[in-house]
């Protein structure tokens, strides 16, 4: 298996060629999302279709270079054939007030699975519980509800929160803590057979209007522990998660992501990083290349439910006139065409364009050095 720099078999296109087809966009978000109000991305009008490079600005060059490897692989190399032409997706609810939940859900027509952001800085468990309750009430008892803490809790906070939120019949909890060892401990304490003695049972649970279960079984999903780790397989070897959340860009592209999930042997949900439709297309092709889970108890590298690929609905605009948005709870697997009018409308300021070009140049140099 190749390392974090991308597939060893992928030829690196020359930097001049990459920069010549590059545009930078800055698209406002509809709702502040994990501190982001404007999403910036470098878009390449590549030979095999548009590709995207959009690591968040705070990421260092070593980490960002995997995202560039993904963009260059997607835009300049043939990809694995998809097994289906549509992918089921989930709605994503940012850390908004509970009263805004219906408005957010309306942007995801037909979705029967919802991921709810929790553990937002400056908020507490009462805010999370109100938000998750609003989602459950809006969606009804048959919908799947997931929570995503983005590693925002410590072990005790995670156990406390997830025992409480189990009231709402969670599908799974994504990255409740940052470290692999922490995930192992949280998973152990939320498994059947745990004593159920914790800081949010009895009186504390009643304060929030919840009825915490004695022994909640909450599956644990790993995201950051896969995509931001030097060893993306460590979480699987440690038994720290029940399933993996994989994102094509930070893992170096579709082919490398497929290699990782095959070796990990855990069920998979494919997600995005608040991408434009171009980045979403990469995620859709990854999801469509994975076999579907068949019934309960499915194991191995299979697609395990609705994917977090509907997030273009959280952007005010896009780089295509026909964005990849949920319809009937699914999105068609296709490569969107860039729209010159949208690229102009959302063009980043000149100083941000320069910043992204310099970043691509540095990351390309890292990839080039690694290839030799």
Across the structure, where does each feature detected by a protein language model lie?
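Short, charged beta->alpha transition segments
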Residues: 75-78, 91-107, 121-123, 131-134
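Flexible C-terminal active-site loop/helix
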Residues: 1-39, 50-54, 76-77, 82, ...
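Hydrophobic faces of well-ordered beta-strands that scaffold small-molecule active sites
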Residues: 44, 49-53, 85-93, 112-116, ...
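Active-site- and interface-proximal helix/loop "cap" or "latch" segments in soluble metabolic
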Residues: 16, 57-84
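N-terminal small/glycine-rich loop or linker at the start of catalytic domains
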Residues: 40, 50, 79-97, 131, ...
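Glycine-rich, proline-tolerant flexible connector loops at the mouths of alpha/beta enzymes
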Residues: 52-62, 112-129
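Catalytic core of soluble alpha/beta enzymes
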Residues: 121-281, 285, 316-324
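Active-site mouth loops of central-metabolism enzymes
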Residues: 27-36, 86-100, 118-120, 149-155, ...
């Amino acid at each position: 298996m190749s390392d974090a720099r991308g597939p060893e078999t992928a030829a690196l296109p020359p930097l001049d060629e990459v920069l010549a087809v590059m545009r930078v966009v800055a698209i406002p978000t509809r709702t502040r999302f994990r501190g982001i109000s404007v999403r910036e991305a470098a878009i390449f009008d590549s030979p095999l279709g548009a590709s995207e490079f959009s690591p968040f600005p705070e990421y260092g060059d070593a980490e960002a270079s995997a995202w560039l490897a993904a963009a260059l692989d997607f835009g300049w190399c043939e990809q694995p054939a998809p097994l289906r032409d549509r992918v089921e997706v989930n709605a994503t609810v940012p850390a908004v007030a509970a009263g805004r939940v219906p408005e957010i859900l309306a942007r995801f027509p037909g979705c029967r699975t919802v991921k709810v952001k929790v553990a937002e800085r400056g908020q507490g468990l009462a805010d999370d519980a109100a938000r998750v309750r609003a989602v459950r009430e809006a969606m009804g008892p048959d919908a799947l509800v997931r929570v995503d803490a983005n590693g925002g809790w410590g072990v005790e906070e995670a156990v406390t929160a997830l025992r409480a939120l189990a009231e709402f019949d969670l599908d799974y909890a994504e990255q409740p803590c940052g470290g692999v060892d922490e995930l192992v401990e949280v998973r152990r304490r939320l498994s059947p057979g745990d004593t159920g003695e914790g800081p949010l049972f009895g009186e504390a649970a009643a304060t929030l209007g919840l009825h915490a279960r004695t022994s909640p079984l909450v599956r644990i999903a790993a995201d950051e522990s896969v995509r931001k780790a030097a060893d993306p397989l460590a979480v699987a070897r440690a038994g720290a998660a029940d399933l993996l959340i994989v994102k094509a860009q930070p893992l170096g592209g579709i082919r490398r992501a497929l290699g990782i999930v095959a070796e990990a042997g855990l069920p998979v949900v494919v997600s995005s990083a608040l991408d434009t439709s171009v980045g979403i297309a990469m995620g859709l092709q990854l999801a469509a290349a994975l076999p579907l889970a068949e019934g309960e108890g499915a194991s191995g590298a299979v697609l395990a439910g609705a994917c977090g690929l509907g997030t273009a609905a959280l952007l005010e605009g896009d780089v295509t006139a026909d964005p990849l948005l949920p319809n009937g709870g699914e999105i068609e697997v296709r490569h969107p065409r860039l729209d010159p009018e949208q690229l102009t409308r959302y063009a980043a300021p000149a100083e941000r364009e320069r910043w992204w070009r310099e970043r691509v140049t540095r990351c390309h140099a890292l990839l080039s050095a690694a290839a030799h």
